[in-house]
């Protein structure tokens, strides 16, 4: 139907007869000559319709609405000098139309403009409801192509490194760890359910047992969890696993993968090795295991200064096993008012959202005296003030914000406040947001954390991570006692405060795997029922192996400078886990439920 695309025409095509297809981006009538901007996936080209070419042709052009689908035959010619458009790649040429064929018309009112000339902001709910139109827009078109090129770059690198792509099952079994599963009832096996995979974790390990050695997959994953801007119920991982590799080797290989992607997509030469930081250091300095290292305001532990303070909020927090930490905002006295920090203020509210009762603060004055509201200053000695300023490196004009209480809440609070203030004060400029790439490996995660709701230990990553050998020793009889306090050979890759990948060395010893499952509270029968196939495989000569899974949607979001992964997915779900375009999920006929041996107990509250 066409021999050229709209966006590829340049001065070199002058005098060529071309046949184009595309959509009417806009139509303009200038002094008896009609100009049509014709758009396809490659860009736009100006079509000129002259009445000298025939009244029938001109009448067709006069009738065209935006988004009408056309096939146009015409002659490429140079634009007059005064009409050259340097803002678009095809701006030196135009096509003189010889014939216009309408392939389809627009019979409904468009809910929003698709034209590249209209940068109108459209509500996301409208965009998602009419996603097929949204995909015609330049921004979404570019994002999908960037996504394709990212996957293409990853595949090219991995295949050159000897990896093969292997598909793993979508219908698998439900396991108790991690987020809620999406369940699929079995018609054939009444009363039994498949689960959609939260990741290909167990199957990729079994591929290593099977001798594949180097595997990757662009894997679809499903998690029934609460949503936010960078989460979806169904998402895509670049999943990688390899045998006979140590942690250092896996990290180095995946750095090369990231470098290759950034070079091909952004034309940027990233510097390696990426910085590394232990989980403990990240929590101490930033209050989070995915710190944004593009700016300072690091957390400072001041518990030693306040342990015997007369300020009971602080001293009681410390005596109860918690801590007192602070962040320092440079020139905060001029930038942040008391109203914002006190109850009802936006910064105070951020602290409350993280679980804190509030924030305490100190302002450093020009004479290095401190000023505050409440009892903090009254309960600080001159030497304590001096030590505080030394420890925080606070200067005159700076604002110090404090959190006190259980360590996990203090960390979470100051991390949230730190991010909020950095964004609010534009500590990172808009240009830096788009051009600064701060990668960081976070390593040495604890194997477990305590789940107070269930009164048991649970794996921080998953129960298949290998512990550090030096933490558990070689004596199997001591593993159960040593595992709860051990660190995992686990590593996350963080970019600008977002986790883009996570992995670990895996347990390849069946007895150690049994012990880990016992530590998280599974009985022998439960472990056998849920993971017996893995334990059996590990007992049959499983090689040392490890890997990583990258969040493809999140990586593309960052490469595209978008704020939400929904803008990098062709047909995403809303934050209510719905497809507003196809109206899914939806009710089904009772007959379908009967065939599956299930019934719905849902009662519509309306």
From Swiss-Prot:
Reaction(s) this enzyme catalyzes, per UniProt: tRNA(Asx) + L-aspartate + ATP = L-aspartyl-tRNA(Asx) + AMP + diphosphate
GO MF, any single term: aspartate-tRNA(Asn) ligase activity
Binding, ATP: 223-225, 232, 499, 551-554
Enzyme Commission no: 6.1.1.23
GO cellular component annotations of the record: cytoplasm
Site (Important for tRNA non-discrimination): 30
UniProt keyword annotations, A-Z: Aminoacyl-tRNA synthetase, ATP-binding, Cytoplasm, Ligase, Nucleotide-binding, Protein biosynthesis
Region feature Aspartate, mapped onto this chain: 201-204
Protein's UniProt keywords contain ATP-binding: yes
Compartments, as annotated in UniProt: Cytoplasm
Gene Ontology biological process: aspartyl-tRNA aminoacylation
Domain of life: Bacteria
Sequence positions that bind L-aspartate: 177, 223, 461, 506
Family indicated by similarity: Belongs to the class-II aminoacyl-tRNA synthetase family. Type 1 subfamily.
Assembly and interaction partners: Homodimer.
Described function: Aspartyl-tRNA synthetase with relaxed tRNA specificity since it is able to aspartylate not only its cognate tRNA(Asp) but also tRNA(Asn). Reaction proceeds in two steps: L-aspartate is first activated by ATP to form Asp-AMP and then transferred to the acceptor end of tRNA(Asp/Asn).
Descriptive protein name: Aspartate--tRNA(Asp/Asn) ligase
């Amino acid at each position: 139907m066409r021999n050229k695309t709209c966006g590829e025409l340049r001065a070199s095509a002058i005098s060529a007869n071309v046949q184009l297809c595309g959509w009417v981006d806009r139509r303009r009538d200038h002094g008896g000559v009609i100009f049509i901007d014709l758009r396809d996936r490659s860009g736009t080209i100006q079509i000129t319709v002259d009445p000298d070419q025939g009244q029938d042709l001109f009448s067709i052009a006069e009738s065209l609405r935006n988004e009408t689908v056309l096939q146009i035959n015409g002659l490429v010619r140079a634009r007059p000098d005064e009409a050259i458009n340097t803002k678009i790649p095809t701006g030196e040429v135009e096509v003189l139309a010889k014939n216009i064929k309408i392939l389809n018309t627009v019979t409904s009112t468009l809910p929003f403009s698709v034209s590249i000339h209209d940068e109108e902001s459209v509500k996301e709910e409208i965009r998602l409801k009419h996603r097929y139109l949204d995909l015609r827009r330049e921004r979404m078109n570019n994002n999908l192509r960037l996504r394709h090129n990212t996957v293409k770059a990853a595949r090219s690198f991995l295949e050159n490194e000897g990896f093969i792509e292997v598909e793993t099952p979508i219908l698998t079994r439900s396991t108790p760890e991690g987020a809620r599963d999406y369940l699929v009832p079995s018609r054939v096996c009444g009363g039994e359910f498949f689960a959609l995979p939260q990741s290909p974790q167990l199957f990729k390990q079994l591929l290593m047992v099977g001798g594949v050695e180097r595997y990757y997959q662009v894997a679809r994953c499903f998690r029934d969890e609460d949503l936010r801007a960078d989460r979806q119920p169904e998402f895509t991982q670049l999943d990688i696993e390899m045998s006979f590799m140590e942690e250092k080797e896996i990290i180095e290989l995946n750095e090369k993968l990231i470098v290759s992607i950034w070079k091909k997509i952004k034309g940027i030469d990233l510097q390696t090795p990426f910085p590394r930081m232990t989980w403990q250091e990240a929590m101490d300095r930033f209050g989070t295991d995915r710190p944004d290292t593009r700016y300072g305001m690091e957390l400072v532990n001041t518990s030693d200064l306040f342990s015997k303070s007369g300020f009971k909020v602080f001293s009681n927090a410390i005596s109860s096993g918690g801590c007192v930490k602070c962040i320092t905002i440079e020139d905060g006295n001029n930038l942040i008012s008391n109203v914002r920090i006190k109850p009802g203020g936006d910064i105070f509210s951020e602290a409350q959202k993280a679980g804190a009762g509030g924030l305490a603060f100190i302002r450093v004055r020009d004479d290095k005296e401190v000023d505050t509201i409440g009892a903090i200053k009254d309960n600080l000695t001159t030497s304590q003030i001096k030590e505080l300023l030394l420890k925080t490196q606070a200067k005159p004009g700076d604002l110090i914000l404090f959190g006190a209480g259980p360590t996990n809440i203090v960390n979470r609070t100051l991390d949230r406040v730190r991010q909020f203030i950095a964004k609010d004060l534009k500590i990172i400029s808009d240009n830096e947001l788009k051009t600064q790439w701060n990668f960081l490996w976070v390593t040495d995660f604890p194997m477990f954390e305590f789940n107070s709701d269930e009164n048991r230990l649970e794996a921080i990553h998953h129960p298949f991570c290998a512990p550090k050998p030096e933490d558990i020793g070689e004596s199997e009889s001591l593993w159960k006692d040593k595992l709860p306090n051990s660190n995992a050979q686990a590593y996350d890759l963080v970019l600008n405060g977002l986790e883009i990948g996570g992995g670990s060395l895996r347990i390849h010893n069946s007895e150690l795997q049994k012990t880990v499952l016992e530590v998280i509270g599974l009985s022998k029968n439960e472990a056998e029922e849920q993971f017996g196939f893995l334990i059996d495989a590990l007992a049959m000569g499983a090689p040392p192996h490890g890997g990583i899974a990258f969040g493809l949607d999140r990586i593309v979001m960052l490469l595209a400078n978008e704020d939400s992964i929904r803008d990098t997915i062709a047909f995403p779900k809303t934050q209510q886990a719905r497809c507003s375009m196809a109206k899914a999920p939806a009710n089904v006929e009772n007959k379908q439920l009967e065939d599956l041996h299930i019934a719905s107990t849902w009662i519509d509250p309306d």
